[in-house]
Amino acid sequence: MDGSFVQHSVRVLQELNKQREKGQYCDATLDVGGLVFKAHWSVLACCSHFFQRIYGDGTGGSVVLPAGFAEIFGLLLDFFYTGHLALTSGNRDQVLLAAKELRVPEAVELCQSFQPQTSVGQAQSGLGQPASQDVKSHLKEPTDLDEEEVFRTLSLASVDQEPRDTEQPQLGTPAQSTTAFLCGKLTQALKPSPSEDKESEDCKEPPRPFEAGGAPLQGESNEWEVVVQVEDDRDGDYVSEPETVLTRRKSKVIRKPCAAEPALGAGSLTAEPTDSRKGAAVPVECPTCHKKFLSKYYLKVHNRKHTGEKPFECPKCGKCYFRKENLLEHEARNCMNRSEQVFTCSVCQETFRRRMELRLHMVSHTGEMPYKCSSCSQQFMQKKDLQSHMIKLHGAPKPHACPTCAKCFLSRTELQLHEAFKHRGEKLFVCEECGHRASSRNGLQMHIKAKHRNERPYVCEFCSHAFTQKANLNMHLRTHTGEKPFQCHLCGKTFRTQASLDKHNRTHTGERPFSCEFCEQRFTEKGPLLRHVASRHQEGRPHFCQICGKTFKAVEQLRVHVRRHKGVRKFECTECGYKFTRQAHLRRHMEIHDRVENYNPRQRKLRNLIIEDEKMVVVALQPPADLEVGSAEVIVESLTQGGLASQLPSQRLCSEESFASPGVLEPSLIITAAVPEDCDT
């Protein structure tokens, strides 16, 4: 034929096989009993109805096949790419079985022609059917309902972009009766954990197994060992991942045949599922992170990760666990013997109870630590310390970056908590006593200690202020010692905290990361942004003082106002001893001492009045005309009106040498008694 190359299709298939052997352009990952095979979805779909039905839309992913196919799946894969099937008398039965289940008709025909007298389907079914009838039963087109149910329940670990909140696959669906033979009869299975039987009645039941249809194999018990994929519930910190980590666990499924149902071949994938689902497990959802579980028991264990509770404690060594299963495994390893185990130094024969102590001791002999910095001479005992050193001192980037805001973190857990709190607004850790939500486990523990247990063990030696954490105390001590260890490399200004230095650096770079969602205005700090939103874009004054009833738009303004009622003025002038509630007021006051000539400060009203004598409060309610000239109430009234110089003669005021200027008034006045009629001048 003109214009055609008959060997073109053969050459293309050969090139695809070479790509498969090199792992090039392979978009399919097949996990068969722990062995990983790379292939092309297009080739798999062309050769197998099994893959064509599931991945006909071209969606990439990975499929987990039964471990029984591990020895012969490579032969089938070679057949897909070369057309040659290496059959022997030893592997013929296994290849035929796999070809039936994966729906590869050409491979089935080759197996039958290789040994036409024996049939795996006939030997296993025990019904006396010839091999041809058994093969036809596998190759015939099932109904749409059967095929949909079959392929919906296959054990797929799809690598898609959407987060998976449910465990795969969920037991309890009737279609899983058709996948039991696909997974195969395994030889061993883990026994159900005894702790699940010892839990409370409302949560001790694991998900009920499905009732599989079909007759049992002759000479075998009515049990199948099915490999399912469930969520890894190891003892560790809660991690809100976009993709659920899956592990393989063996679960025993009891097969209960029904007397009314017809006898079907055990190996058939087209067995119709039962319509009755009596006692099927209903998924339950976590109210905090909306993760779904198959039973209340798993939900109860999962909630402990939000609360940080570890109720199961080893009586021998005191180690605690989230789950009782982990405690039983720990006890099975004979923790008492492990605690009595000693480690001996090979140089000086000194013994240690812990391996880490021995490693630290060996440094005294060798002078070398296992982890060395490549940029300097420092050495470390742990890899995480070396990583932290490289980031802080040598500018190495943090390994885990946030895709939304490009912020980097040392660990994946920190990144996931950051995404949940900052970008999704989730606070996954909930206090069981008051319902308070925290963004981290450490924040929840701090809340419990401070609010419910009143534990503040770290006390300042200067002002007796107590703190829940030692780091907060150390930061507070810098206000007394004047230590400012963080210095700007551009202008040399020093700060007490790294956060303050970061805020200052934005004044040099011009960065304004906090933007208003209502207008185009941007801010360098979050506090000014909140005040801007409260004053510009929120109606009303929702925050009010419970003492005097004054209302405010921003909660920070209310906090400053309450300090005046309490008499708290922590910003003190070093020149004259005046105290102020805000640092801005202190800076404005310092201008008095800087200016020498032609300074006439603006008269300010009295901002707050603290009266310790209750009798003065009653007298203060009287009209000013009824009071005597020398009483304190007239002075207070004059101060509030801002006209002290015009209402009182100069000789009525007591002179103080500490006053730097006669026109400067203290912004607060504490009155304990009436002012005398005559004052010495």
Swiss-Prot record:
Organism the protein comes from: Mus musculus (Mouse)
SMART domains noted in UniProt: BTB, ZnF_C2H2
GO cellular component entries: chromosome, telomeric region; nucleus
Pfam family, one: zf-C2H2
Zinc finger (C2H2-type): 284-306, 343-365, 371-394, 400-423, 429-452, 458-480, 486-508, 514-537, 543-565, 571-593
Residues annotated for Zn(2+) 2 binding in this entry: 314, 317, 330, 335
Highest classification ranks of the organism: Eukaryota, Metazoa, Chordata, Craniata, Vertebrata
Protein name: Zinc finger and BTB domain-containing protein 48
Gene name in the database record: Zbtb48
Region (Disordered): 121-176, 189-222
Similarity-based family: Belongs to the krueppel C2H2-type zinc-finger protein family.
Binding site for Zn(2+) 5: 545, 548, 561, 589
One GO BP: regulation of RNA metabolic process
UniProt-annotated binding residues for Zn(2+) 4: 373, 376, 389, 394
Subunit structure: Interacts with EP300.
Record's function text: Plays a critical role in transcriptional regulation and chromatin remodeling. Acts as a regulator of telomere length. Directly binds the telomeric double-stranded 5'-TTAGGG-3' repeat. Preferentially binds to telomeres that have a low concentration of shelterin complex and acts as a regulator of telomere length by initiating telomere trimming, a process that prevents the accumulation of aberrantly long telomeres. Also acts as a transcription regulator that binds to promoter regions. Regulates expression of a small subset of genes, including MTFP1.
Compartments reported by the entry: Nucleus; Chromosome, Telomere
Composition bias type Polar residues, residue spans: 121-134
The keyword Transmembrane helix is assigned to this record: no
Record-annotated BTB domain positions: 26-89
Listed Basic and acidic residues bias regions: 194-208
Entry keyword set: Activator, Chromosome, DNA-binding, Isopeptide bond, Metal-binding, Nucleus, Repeat, Telomere, Transcription, Transcription regulation, Ubl conjugation, Zinc, Zinc-finger
Residues given in the record as Zn(2+) 6 binding sites: 573, 576, 589, 593
Superkingdom: Eukaryota
Annotated CDD domains: BTB_POZ_ZBTB48_TZAP_KR3 (cd18232)
